[in-house]
Amino acid sequence: MEDSQETSPSSNNSSEELSSALHLSKGMSIFLDILRRADKNDDGKLSFEEFKAYFADGVLSGEELHELFHTIDTHNTNNLDTEELCEYFSQHLGEYENVLAALEDLNLSILKAMGKTKKDYQEASNLEQFVTRFLLKETLNQLQSLQNSLECAMETTEEQTRQERQGPAKPEVLSIQWPGKRSSRRVQRHNSFSPNSPQFNVSGPGLLEEDNQWMTQINRLQKLIDRLEKKDLKLEPLEEEIIEGNTKSHIMLVQRQMSVIEEDLEEFQLALKHYVESASSQSGCLRISIQKLSNESRYMIYEFWENSSVWNSHLQTNYSKTFQRSNVDFLETPELTSTMLVPASWWILNNN
């Protein structure tokens, strides 16, 4: 299936050769696309870390993902190739075999129609241009309606599975150090952020703004984390903070690091904006702050939540999963996520 991300001629050729060699049945070309998108170091195969980054759904545990990986790895190489992916999933497609085949046809039909539109639209009459715009809009509406139905079904099945497991499973948290980054074609382009500020500001009620007070607090926390990572750290007694029993003593701070592919920067910014808008409207979300590192396509996202339960529930929401899925294409490497509990009194103090 097509993907907006560029691929090199050699990559396209190898995909075509592989598809021909495997004699893929109708609809199975999706697994060529899955391998290409999940293969972050472009070596033509999936390591367990790459497999986990792509397939983790917040329901299967790390152990279950590891077991699934080795079940698919019939060649016993500790890596997965397209043949192994196709061989495993083809045994479990059921009715989705027809769905994938239809998607393959639909993908080709839409690309053909858009190619025709690009070629003829400028010279068409006003009425013909109107019809083209109308058909594009209605096609999009139909696809969005189907997407909403699929997302509803996906949420229902995941919730049912969690209930059967007697409680929500803690999603697999990715914290992977990658030896190298996917080679991307770095191009100097206009940055839609303010050239005088490394901060990413999302305007609108309840959203982020550049806040020196909060950035100071965040920088303090970052320094604390850096200190805690040093082996020679010596802890000394500090002044005790006495907390009443009926007081919520801690809040959850989540730090997310994302390295964005330069060519996908604008699309990532739009997806991030939608994510922040949705997350900030949740009752358990106290605040979200975003930093963009200067001269890099790297973002630091800090999320403050009332507690870990609210955070885990947030991970299962539709908008959060949509953002996670889009990041598969937008990020050079899987995002790094870390969490820590901080005294709730900090929040109360800074908001009084």
Curated annotation (Swiss-Prot):
The family database entries (InterPro entries) matched by this protein are listed as: ABM_dom, Dimeric_a/b-barrel, EF-hand-dom_pair, EF_Hand_1_Ca_BS, EF_hand_dom, NECAB1/2/3
Q: Where does Ca(2+) bind?
A: D39, N41, D43, K45, E50
Keywords in alphabetical order, please: Calcium, Coiled coil, Cytoplasm, Metal-binding, Phosphoprotein, Repeat
Its main subcellular localisation, reduced to a broad class, is cytoplasm
Q: Which residues carry this modification: Phosphoserine?
A: S4, S192, S197
EF-hand domain spans which residues?
Answer: 26-61, 60-95
Q: Where is the ABM domain?
A: 252-340
Q: Which portions of this protein are annotated as coiled-coil regions?
A: 135-163, 209-275
Extract the GO molecular function terms from the UniProt entry. Answer: calcium ion binding; identical protein binding
Cellular compartment(s): Cytoplasm
Its GO CC terms are: cilium; cytosol; nucleoplasm
A biological process (GO) of this protein is: regulation of amyloid precursor protein biosynthetic process
Region entry Disordered, spans? 180-202
Task: Locate the compositionally biased regions of type Polar residues.
Answer: 190-202
Q: How does it assemble?
A: Interacts with STX1. May interact with CPNE6.
Q: Which PANTHER family match?
A: EF-HAND DOMAIN-CONTAINING PROTEIN, N-TERMINAL EF-HAND CALCIUM-BINDING PROTEIN 1
* The protein, known as: N-terminal EF-hand calcium-binding protein 1
Source lineage: Eukaryota, Metazoa, Chordata, Craniata, Vertebrata
